Amino acid sequence: GAPEETASYTVTCFDPDAPTGSGFWHWVVYDIPADINELTTGAGSQDGSTLPAGAKQLKNDAGLFGYLGSAPPAGHGVHRYMFAVHALNVASLPITEDVSPAICGFNMFGTTIGRAIVTSVYEQN
């Protein structure tokens, strides 16, 4: 379970193997209320209509809102996709939906009290 002092969650998906020199953010959703323990199918849609009340998405590194699926360049090898759930001790991050995922991460520093990461892999030949 989550730490007792959890006030909200942030969910991220990051590909550290993208050929950008800095990886690729596929999804960031933040300000998920602490009483939420799952996201519904379709939660990563661009309009965010099935996200829990109060939750917000940032643009991914393709400049789009919503989850962007795995699509490594053909022949580039195996890419890791790190799905993380961050437990925060604040109900809301002091950011707006126009900031980058890096700024979100900076604002989570000092408020993250727990984290779980599941890493999947995908390769396109």
Can you annotate each of these PLM segments?
Residues 1-125:
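N-terminus-centered regions that define maturation/targeting leaders and the start
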